[in-house]
Amino acid sequence: MARARRTTAAVKPRQDLAAARAGAPALTALAAPLSGFIDAKGYVEIAGVADSFGMSKSQLAETIGLGRETLYKAARAQAAKTQSRMREMLEIIGRVSAWAGGKEQAMAWYRAQPIPAFGDRTAESLVKSGQAGPLRDYLDHIAMGGFA
């Protein structure tokens, strides 16, 4: 009886999940254009993200649902919750940037466009309330040709 061989495609999602839980870099290929925001230690470079979108750190913190001062202190900026929220935001923006016409337009969509499938909530409000997973599933469904 032949054993089924595991492919890297089958292992990759688990590695991404494990890496995300460990705080290591785990942006998917869909977010590759935004992966330049990851430093050598595997943390999201907060200042780089803020500069890239023309925001202050306070505005960026508000965008991901954290306190205004959170991103100014290194220990808090590197905390698991902070890094997780940043990665979720970057992944979602990375997924829609090609559809939106660029990362700036994707950020505008993220912050302001109501999504009917989620009761007209924005992607920003979904990430803030911890519902990035269902939003990613929804975006995957749309990418595969599904209806909104």
Describe every region a protein language model picked out.
Residues M1-A148:
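Non-transmembrane "mature" sequence context
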